[in-house]
């Protein structure tokens, strides 16, 4: 029993693959035959893929010629010039006009990128100095110069601006030990209106007091606003007036002319036991300042050599760090 195509559901119907086969062909041939023929013909046509063009692999000779042309100033060659370049490069290998054109475009883009990167990275000047303001000591002594390692001493109430008498006696005074105060073995001197003096009591640097000591306002050794905040030590200033009766070796001065009253040699700041102290530049008398048994070492742990009187062979370095043992 057979039935015509017009009685089939629409989902099985398909259009003819060729316009020459008209309605009469549909009646004679079932629709599924047309469907299979269409698929077969389309599958055969899809297999006909054109061969890909070979990729251009430039030869070293071709690259050298292109670079020389680009460096000579030819950045965007016209079509006629591209053809002449292509003919010249064909001697070393296969190449097309499009390859030449795109090479110049890419070369121009790379040159612009290199120039842009060069302008965005300026060179550091040798005169620039690096300052590290991150340590706790910077809040007291200012910034630290990385090249010299010096701590600039700021203005402080403890810095003596007027002449004052300053002695380095080498005798033991019990009253000085009672008025001295400090940190461990290192005792801090106090600047008074009558001057200040050091003595060697218990191998520490102590104070000789007078009757006006109670009139001196309290000194904030920890910096800050005076309310106990902070942990910084203000720089101590050694007055520079030299007593004429004191020997030159006792005040840390080397030979030369006699030193009289009201003589102000050059001052410098050194750090002894992490505290800044201003001393006279030149040779320093360790025994006169800190006692007969005192030994001064540098930041490398090497002792500072002195003669039999305690005078250093070399002057102390400005801004250097020393330790008293």
From Swiss-Prot:
Disulfide bonds: none annotated. Its main location: nucleus. One of its GO terms (molecular function) is DNA-binding transcription factor activity. Gene3D superfamilies: Homeodomain-like (1.10.10.60). The keyword Transcription regulation applies. It comes from Arabidopsis thaliana. Residues 51-115 bind DNA. This is WUSCHEL-related homeobox 8. Keywords: Developmental protein, DNA-binding, Homeobox, Nucleus, Transcription, Transcription regulation. Expressed only in the egg cell. Not detected in the pollen tube. Expressed in the zygote, the basal cell, and later the suspensor. Expressed in all suspensor cells, except the hypophysis, and in the embryo surrounding region (ESR) endosperm cells. Strongly expressed in the suspensor cells, with a weak expression also detected throughout the developing embryo. Probable transcription factor, which may be involved in embryonic patterning. May be required for basal embryo development after fertilization. Acts partially redundantly with STIP in promoting embryonic cell division and proliferation. Promotes cotyledon boundary formation by maintaining the symmetry in CUC genes expression domains. SUPFAM superfamilies: Homeodomain-like. Induction: Up-regulated in the zygote after fertilization by the transcription factor WRKY2. Up-regulated by CLE8.
């Amino acid at each position: 029993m057979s039935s015509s195509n017009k009685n089939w559901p629409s989902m099985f119907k398909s259009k003819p693959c060729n316009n020459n086969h008209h309605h009469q062909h549909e009646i004679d041939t079932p629709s599924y035959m047309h469907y299979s023929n269409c698929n077969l013909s389309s599958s055969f046509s899809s297999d006909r893929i054109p061969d890909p063009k070979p990729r251009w692999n430039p030869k070293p000779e071709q690259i050298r010629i292109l670079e020389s042309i680009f460096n000579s100033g030819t950045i965007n060659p016209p079509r006629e010039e591209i053809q002449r370049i292509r003919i010249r490069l064909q001697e070393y290998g296969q190449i097309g006009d499009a390859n030449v054109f795109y090479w110049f475009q890419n070369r121009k883009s790379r040159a612009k990128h290199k120039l842009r990167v060069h302008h965005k990275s300026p060179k550091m000047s040798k005169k620039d100095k690096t300052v590290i303001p991150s340590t706790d000591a910077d809040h007291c002594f200012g910034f630290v110069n990385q090249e010299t390692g010096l701590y600039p001493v700021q203005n402080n109430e403890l810095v003596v601006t007027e002449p004052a008498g300053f002695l380095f006696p080498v005798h033991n005074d019990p009253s000085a030990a009672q008025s001295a105060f400090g940190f461990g073995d290192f005792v801090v001197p106090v600047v008074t209106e009558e001057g200040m003096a050091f003595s060697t009591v218990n191998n520490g640097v102590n104070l000789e007091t007078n009757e006006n000591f109670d009139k001196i306002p309290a000194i904030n050794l920890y910096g800050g606003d005076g309310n106990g905040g902070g942990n910084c030590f203000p720089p101590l200033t050694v007055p520079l007036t030299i007593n004429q009766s004191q020997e030159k070796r006792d005040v840390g001065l080397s030979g030369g002319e006699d030193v009289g009253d009201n003589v102000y040699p050059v001052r410098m700041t050194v750090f002894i036991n992490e505290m800044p102290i201003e001393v006279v530049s030149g040779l320093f008398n360790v025994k006169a300042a800190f006692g007969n048994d005192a030994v001064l070492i540098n930041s490398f742990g090497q002792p500072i050599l002195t003669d039999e009187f305690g005078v250093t062979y070399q002057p102390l370095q400005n801004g250097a760090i020393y330790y008293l043992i």
